[in-house]
Amino acid sequence: MSQLSLFSAEARPAALTDLAGLLCGPGQIVRFGAGDQARLSIVLADATRAPAVRSACAEAGVGAQAVVTESGTTALRTAFRCDLAELARAWTRGAVKMVPQEWQLDGPTLRLWALTAGAPDGRGGYLLGLDPHAPQTHQALVAATTRVGLPPARIGDALRISGTRRVARLVELVGPPPARLPAGAWPRYRGRAAC
């Protein structure tokens, strides 16, 4: 039996702050009115992930609705909510998405990032997608993944986690694959998914 990491996704119950994982990838958060409400949205590259992402949002206490965009892709969005305003304040400067200073990545947040924007690279590594429309977040996310023990290589609009120890650490942090996730999409270590 392996020891549970204090930073893994299974170390604590889901929390609203875990939704920052959507913002590590292509997610967006916008404030409304006086800034006391915010809406979180994300366009998914893979529509089959929508049920798993909706379930993860619900575990964090936030409902998300699936919609089809004008371009035909699937997006998830929340209602405007007061409890998302603090996340919006932390992750934006004006209308620009920014990673909070000294922000610490953890397992639950990394799990949502992998769920929404992660993919195996076909060579034993794993890619964590970045927001191509927010290049100002990329270097801070490189630093955050490095601080959590996953120093990545930047490959275009993604961070590549590779190497036996790093992939094992990633598998440890994200925990087992969500029930509704398509097969083969979750990080694996030597052919084994997290268990």
Q: Locations of the language-model features?
A:
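Internal intein/HINT superfamily modules and their associated LAGLIDADG
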Residues: 1-195
